[in-house]
Curated annotation (Swiss-Prot):
CDD domains from the UniProt entry: INT_XerDC_C
Residues annotated as domain Tyr recombinase: 158-349
Protein name: Tyrosine recombinase XerC
Family from the record: Belongs to the 'phage' integrase family. XerC subfamily.
One GO process term, biological-process aspect: cell division
Compositionally biased spans, kind Low complexity: 141-154
Active site (record annotation): 200, 224, 301, 304, 327, 336
Family matches, as PANTHER family: PHAGE INTEGRASE-RELATED (PTHR30349), TYROSINE RECOMBINASE XERC (PTHR30349:SF77)
Length: 355
């Protein structure tokens, strides 16, 4: 990321947002990048003072950025820039607010892609089948020398060095088998939880073990703006989570270094090296599962869309789904009613004789 002479102002603005707006770390990072890119462009044009920037300059910046970015990205960039100049004006850094009338690009209301209920079932069935196929009982290393007493009696004349060399590959295979099983259990739990709750992938990877309440079958979710909500989940998700926590998680936790283990001690989901799983791995898990299940390629966010649509199809109230998804606006949740209507029209066309 290019640095600018305005970095100090950007830092102050981001600190202000962090303290007063409760925005997520990802949003703050995006705003910082947007502002740095914007002000760097003006710097290249010879601007040395924020007071030199006009509304026409900002419109010119938008025209340049629009060539390479989607409207949704431009909407976020515009919000960041408008917020920055409003803050600068309020704090006496500028004599006017050139961005006060800067218009946010309109975003077309597109229907989110979703799986059908049967496709979602197929996706989860494949993940469950992978757990059964890769099932390997891990004993924490206690059985590494199983049968070694008899072997020692028969081969007493062999050197200890020879025995150790012959046992090493078996121990390595055992560790690999246990890891594959653990990852299958983790993947199944991730897919079940994403579909059962409709949570965002960022919310999933930030979850701790303590956020799960098995007695009430609910999870505590920390969403955008650090807002918390409680979301229920069903029996299939409970079973998958219990299997992961009791059998799979301990296996992956043992692969971590002490430093990683300390940082990920409370994490619900772990990566192959025992650290807290990141969003990229979670997305890969969903994409790979979709390929293996033979359903349309989807992202974790599309799985969230699917969950919301299926819950509404089942008769849930729109306000309840809004609360479950953590939407601040009911308008955002209403998109899923449009999807449900489209699916209803499709089913109507297939089933009704006078369609």
């Amino acid at each position: 990321m290019s640095s600018t002479q305005f970095d100090g102002d950007i830092d102050s603005f981001v600190s202000y947002l962090k303290s007063n707006r409760g925005l997520s770390a990802n949003t703050l990072k995006a705003y910082r990048a947007d502002l740095t890119a914007c002000l760097h462009l003006f710097e290249l044009r010879g601007v040395t003072d924020l007071n030199e920037i006009t509304l026409d300059d900002l419109r010119s910046w938008m025209a340049v950025e629009s060539r390479d970015h989607a409207r949704s990205s431009m909407a976020r960039k515009t919000v960041a820039v408008r917020g920055f100049f409003a803050w600068a004006y309020e704090h006496g850094l500028t004599a006017t607010d050139p961005a006060a009338t800067l218009m946010t690009p309109s975003i077309p209301s597109t229907l989110p892609a979703v799986l059908t209920e049967s496709q979602a079932e197929q996706l989860l069935d494949v993940a469950e089948h992978a757990v059964a196929t890769n099932q390997y009982k891990d004993d924490g290393g206690a059985a590494a020398a199983s049968g070694s007493g008899k072997a020692a009696g028969k081969t007493a004349d062999k050197s200890a060095d020879t025995v150790n060399r012959s046992e090493a590959p078996a121990r390595a295979d055992k560790r690999d088998n246990a890891r594959v099983t653990a990852e299958s259990q983790r993947n199944a739990a991730i897919l079940e939880l994403l579909y059962a709750t409709g949570i965002r992938v960022a919310e999933l990877v930030s979850m701790d073990i303590a956020d799960i309440d098995f007695s009430n079958r609910t999870i505590k979710v920390t969403g955008k703006g650090n807002k918390q909500r409680v979301v229920p989940f069903g029996l299939p998700a409970q079973r998958a989570l219990e299997t992961w926590l009791e059998q799979g998680r301990p296996v992956l936790a043992r692969t971590a270094t002490d430093a990683v283990k300390s940082r990920a001690a409370n994490a619900l989901f772990l990566g192959a090296r025992g650290g807290r799983i990141d969003q990229r791995i979670a997305r890969d898990i969903v994409h790979r599962a979709a390929r293996e299940a033979g359903v349309p390629d989807i992202s974790p966010h599309a799985l969230r869309h699917s969950a919301a649509t299926h819950i509404l199809d089942g008769g849930a109230d729109l306000r309840e789904v809004q609360e479950m998804l953590g939407h601040s606006s009911l308008k955002t949740t209403q998109r899923y009613t449009h999807v449900s209507i489209e699916q209803l029209k499709n089913r109507y066309g297939q089933a009704f004789p006078r369609a």
